[in-house]
């Protein structure tokens, strides 16, 4: 959600940002609705003042035993009550229209975010690691199916497309990855582990900017609740409607959960393998900060996500997204892209975003400093630390040998005692 006062004061900034996102002319529409709302509020306040004054005079007339005047004033108050109801409806209608328009408009990028239309305009910040020399690398699906440990056909029979069944050593490797990530983020990076609900209500989905714009990308139950597309939703919602002590910030939460996405806009993209699934596991990172802390916390979060790839010795690059490629709620976003030998390119494995106070305004999450009056909105940040399925894909492809065996990364061997490879002798 946006601060209407900021839009009034710097309309050009908002118009430029929204036009770049394909929503030109919205500022004029917002200011028109804002003017109508303020006019309705002024008229309502005037009518309330007139009613209060008339009610006061009724008492005075009765005290003076002027029944005729009292009767006239009472009739006038009744007329004002009807006018107040009508004016109140005008105010509600204008307010709802303004809120609905603001709710559908994306966040404003930070000043340092580069201009650009799409992923081709993103800026590479750094690279880590060198891709291994692998002769004729196989893709992860071919490797998994050859071992008999990755079954897309069985998944399709029971669930349809974009699902997978992992078995045996591969299921164990996937579990080890998730546990390793969670241990790293909690034991070394100071995140508090949370086991959150996988179903959330409209308020939680709205507060984390998934509703109303992205309803078609979510799965909804028959009772109206939503399966989480990411643990960002319940983790950030821990502060929904709350006032937290500034002295306790930053708050850092992490969770390993299944995530559910309809992939409504992904027709024809990544149809083979595990890159784009309706259900997948992910370790999520969420931070709640003061406005002054959020920029540094963002850089820290990116480092926490990068640490997973470094420990696994997977080559990757870190990209600063341009304005046109950022998500709806993001003020600034870094993507981590891991090297996939079969595709001979880097693919997204994590996205770390600073939303500023965009989500906090939607969910009314505030902070208060001890000894001071008033509150202010917190800043919220979220990132993948990492997507477990895509990390499994990267491990399979980067650690394959010519015989189709997969070496287990050193960082994962404590989670798989006695094993050094998958697909052959231990």
Swiss-Prot record:
It catalyses: tRNA(Ser) + L-serine + ATP = L-seryl-tRNA(Ser) + AMP + diphosphate + H(+); tRNA(Sec) + L-serine + ATP = L-seryl-tRNA(Sec) + AMP + diphosphate + H(+). One of its GO terms (biological process) is selenocysteine biosynthetic process. It is found in: Cytoplasm. GO terms for cellular component: cytoplasm. InterPro entries: aa-tRNA-synt_IIb, aa-tRNA-synth_II, aa-tRNA-synth_II/BPL/LPL, Ser-tRNA-ligase_type_1, Ser-tRNA-synth_1_N, SerRS_1_N_sf, SerRS_core, tRNA-bd_arm. Pathway: Aminoacyl-tRNA biosynthesis; selenocysteinyl-tRNA(Sec) biosynthesis; L-seryl-tRNA(Sec) from L-serine and tRNA(Sec): step 1/1. Keywords: Aminoacyl-tRNA synthetase, ATP-binding, Cytoplasm, Ligase, Nucleotide-binding, Protein biosynthesis. It is an enzyme of class 6 (ligase). L-serine binds at residues 230-232, 284, 384. It comes from the Bacteria. One of its GO terms (molecular function) is serine-tRNA ligase activity. Its main location: cytoplasm. Consists of two distinct domains, a catalytic core and a N-terminal extension that is involved in tRNA binding. PANTHER family: SERINE--TRNA LIGASE, SERYL-TRNA SYNTHETASE. Homodimer. The tRNA molecule binds across the dimer. Catalyzes the attachment of serine to tRNA(Ser). Is also able to aminoacylate tRNA(Sec) with serine, to form the misacylated tRNA L-seryl-tRNA(Sec), which will be further converted into selenocysteinyl-tRNA(Sec). Belongs to the class-II aminoacyl-tRNA synthetase family. Type-1 seryl-tRNA synthetase subfamily. This is Serine--tRNA ligase. It comes from Phenylobacterium zucineum (strain HLK1). The gene is serS.
């Amino acid at each position: 959600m946006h601060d209407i006062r900021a839009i009034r004061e710097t309309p050009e900034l908002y118009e430029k940002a929204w036009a770049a996102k394909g929503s030109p002319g919205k500022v004029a529409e917002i200011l028109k609705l804002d003017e109508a709302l303020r006019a309705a509020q002024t008229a309502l306040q005037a009518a309330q003042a007139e009613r209060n004054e008339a009610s006061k005079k009724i008492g005075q007339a009765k005290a003076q035993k002027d029944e005729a005047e009292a009767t006239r004033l009472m009739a006038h108050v009744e007329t004002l009550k009807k006018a107040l109801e009508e004016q109140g409806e005008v105010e509600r209608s204008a307010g709802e229209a303004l809120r609905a328009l603001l709710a559908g408009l994306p966040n404003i990028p930070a000043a340092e975010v580069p201009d650009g239309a799409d992923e081709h305009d993103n800026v590479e910040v750094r690279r880590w690691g060198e891709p291994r020399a692998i002769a004729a690398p196989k893709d992860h699906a071919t490797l998994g199916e050859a071992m008999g440990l990755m079954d897309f056909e069985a998944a399709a029979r029971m669930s349809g497309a974009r699902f997978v069944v992992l078995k045996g050593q591969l299921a164990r490797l996937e579990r080890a990855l998730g546990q390793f990530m969670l241990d790293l983020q909690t034991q070394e990076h100071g995140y508090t582990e949370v086991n959150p609900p996988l179903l959330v209500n409209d308020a939680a989905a709205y507060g984390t900017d998934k509703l109303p714009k992205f309803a078609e990308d979510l799965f909804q139950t028959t009772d109206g609740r939503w399966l989480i597309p990411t643990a960002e939703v319940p983790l950030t919602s821990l502060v929904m409607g709350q006032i937290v002590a500034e002295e306790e910030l930053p708050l850092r939460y992490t969770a390993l959960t299944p995530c559910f996405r309809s992939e409504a806009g992904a027709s024809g993209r990544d149809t083979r393998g595990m890159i784009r699934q309706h259900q997948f596991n992910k370790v999520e990172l969420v931070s709640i900060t003061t406005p002054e802390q959020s920029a540094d916390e963002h850089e820290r979060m990116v480092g926490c996500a990068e640490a997973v790839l470094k420990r696994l010795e997977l080559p990757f690059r870190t990209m600063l997204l341009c304005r046109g490629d950022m998500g709806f709620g993001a003020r600034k976003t870094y993507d981590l892209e891991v090297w996939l030998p079969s595709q001979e390119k880097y693919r997204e494995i994590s996205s770390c975003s600073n939303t500023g106070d965009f989500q906090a305004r939607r969910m009314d999450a505030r902070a208060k400093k001890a000894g001071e009056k008033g509150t202010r909105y917190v800043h919220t940040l979220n990132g993948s630390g990492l997507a477990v399925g895509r990390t499994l894909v990267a491990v399979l492809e980067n650690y394959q040998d010519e015989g189709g065996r997969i070496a287990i990364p050193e960082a994962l061997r404590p989670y798989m005692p006695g094993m050094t490879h998958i697909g052959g002798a231990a």
